[in-house]
From Swiss-Prot:
Binding note for cofactor: Binds 4 FAD per tetramer. Each FAD binding site is formed by three monomers.
Motif ThyX motif in this chain: 95-105
Binding site for FAD: R95, H96, R97, Q103, N188, Y189, R190, H194
One Pfam family named in its UniProt record: Thy1
Record protein name field: Flavin-dependent thymidylate synthase
Recorded family membership: Belongs to the thymidylate synthase ThyX family.
Residues reported in the UniProt entry to bind dUMP: E92, L93, I94, R95, Q103, L104, S105, Q106, R107, R172, R199
GO biological process: dTMP biosynthetic process; dTTP biosynthetic process; methylation
Length: 250
């Protein structure tokens, strides 16, 4: 019986900032937030912080977002390793073209024991879950049968790696959209804000919405001055959404 895979989002990289020693400026933040402030001040050489309202890093970044100077947000980035996400969800995710992706390859990784991501609409219904798991088991059995026969068909191929790849790339056609995949996603702060605004909305598919909100929670921990304007609320159906009056790039 196919195992189910829960969503897991792991922070694996974030920006480090190294202040140039010859610039007469300090800040009360570090990492990506400091870099964004530095980039903004570099545009105007405002190292002396002449405006009291933007003298702190949080005040400066709030002003940057308020006035729509989003270009400076592109200097800082965050990377996540995401597992427990379905292939159907990553088909939506990779439409965000400002991100960089490295996804599990079904041509190289055998999927005979792959896990299944249960869609949100089926989670609380044992009968529907059972139907889903049965369908996944049937497709995996067909995948395994096809793989065996395809490897035999390509037996004349002397390169064993190529032979297995040719078999897997054909057999994977029968795998369901619910098959778990794993993916590394890297993006700058501006791209992440756009993703959250688009995919944490009540109009988004629930699976990618959950992903967006989990990413948001971790982004707030990394760069609160950049992401804390998003508010997470719960809808009548129990699902969560995140919105911000400052998320103007949608």
């Amino acid at each position: 019986m196919a195992e189910t895979a829960p969503l897991r989002v792991q922070l694996i990289a974030k920006t480090e900032f190294l202040a140039p020693p010859d610039v007469p400026w300090t800040t009360d933040a570090d990492g990506g937030e400091a870099l964004v402030e530095f980039a903004g001040r570099a545009c105007y050489q405002s190292w002396s912080k002449p405006n009291p309202k933007t003298a702190t890093n949080a005040g400066y970044l709030r002003h940057i977002i308020d006035v729509g100077h989003f270009a400076v947000l592109e200097h800082a980035s965050v990377s996540f390793y995401i597992s427990g996400i379905s292939r159907s969800c990553t088909h939506e995710l990779i439409r965000h073209r400002h991100f960089s992706y490295s996804q599990l390859s079904q041509r190289y990784v055998p999927e005979g024991d792959s896990r299944v991501v249960v869609p949100p609409g089926l989670e609380d219904d044992p009968e529907l879950r059972e139907i889903l798991i049965a369908a996944a088991d049937a497709s995996r059995a067909t995948y395994t049968e096809l793989l065996t026969k395809l490897e035999a068909r390509f037996a004349d191929q002397p390169n064993a790696v190529l032979r297995r790849k040719q078999a897997r790339q054909a057999a994977r056609a029968v795998l369901p959209n619910a098959t778990e995949t794993r993916i590394v996603v890297s993006g700058n702060y501006r791209a992440w804000r756009h993703f959250i605004a688009m995919r944490a909305s009540e109009h988004a598919d629930v699976e990618i919405r959950r992903l967006a909100i989990e990413c948001l929670r971790q982004l707030v921990a990394v760069a609160p001055a950049v992401f804390a304007d998003f508010e997470v609320t719960t809808l009548a159906d129990g699902s969560e959404v995140a919105t911000s009056p400052l998320a103007t790039e949608v």
